Amino acid sequence: MKKQRIVVKIGSSSLTNSKGSIDEAKIREHVQAISVLKKAGHEMILITSGAVAAGFSSLGYPSRPVTIKGKQAAAAVGQTLLMQQYMNQFKQYSLTPGQILLTRNDFSKRERYRNAYATIMELLERGVIPIINENDSTSVEELTFGDNDMLSALVSGLIHADQLMILTDINGLYDANPNENPEAKRFDYLPEITPELLGYAGSAGSKVGTGGMKSKLLATQTALSLGVKVFIGTGSGEQKLADILDGRGDGTYIGDKELSSVNNTRQWIQFHSPISGEIIIDAGAEEAMIHNGSSLLPAGVVGVNGSFPKGAVVEVRGPGGVIGKGQTHYSSEEIMEAKGKRSDELDFEKTFEVIHRNDWVNVKD
């Protein structure tokens, strides 16, 4: 089997005991399974929850705190304890982990987005196992990922992973709640995530985590759109990840084998960039951009809403509504000066595209 880049996401419920505290035996087993694939030549990246679960009891909380300040305090203590556990376990296999804590700003700010990519790739190049978690001790409620399921999908896309393995306490996706309906049927394979499947999943999560099955499916949708196949399920023993990789996992495999990776510029535009304004285009430009993959030229621009600098990301609206978003080559003032004009009517420096097709993401097909 060729070397693969694999992201493993482990949720709180797969790391904790019945009291909600970190279970050292569970961490040991996860590390063993990761080490098996690492020793086989694969690149391994771990997205781990558990900082809050690891720290809340040390602060005197009887259970997982629900307030932001409580979670942040627990995470500040717990992240150190959690990382110490991982370091001790990986040391048994002569492997070195490296900690990366991310927030929304690390994705929405273009330079930080590039830096996150460069750091992870350097760690992989050096044979280190990146251990990634949201920076729960500094994130504010409005800026959090909501759960590490989505973080795992975004990281998988960022580094162009071959597969995302989401480990949970349920062995895959069912057409009904298996805890309530003994007739519930498991899906062993799904080509995609549909609205109907999201309805099956519901929204409830476990008492120690923040992500239910629905959040995992939303993350899966994102991963698939970025060209990453997904497995959702469970397993036991040091061979569990190897079994998943070989198609023998206890869960649901999601995604077509022919998925195409998405370059980082388009990923950033599609999922992370702030929207600074809007460009209005005519029907001809709409047709060319949606169906022909064309760049946006000044001749197709009708108007501009908002004030924005060169390099801003804006939505593009045609007669049929918003058709996508892209990064502009000119400021709003320059676009207004050039709108509706043919190339031979413009100064030389303004004959280039308003939005190049490589800096463009369709939201309509």
Swiss-Prot record:
Enzyme Commission number, as recorded: 2.7.2.11
GO molecular function, a single term: RNA binding
UniProt keyword Membrane present: no
Signal sequence region: none
Places the protein is found: Cytoplasm
Pathway involvement of the protein, from the record: Amino-acid biosynthesis; L-proline biosynthesis; L-glutamate 5-semialdehyde from L-glutamate: step 1/2
Protein name: Glutamate 5-kinase 1
This protein's encoding gene: proB
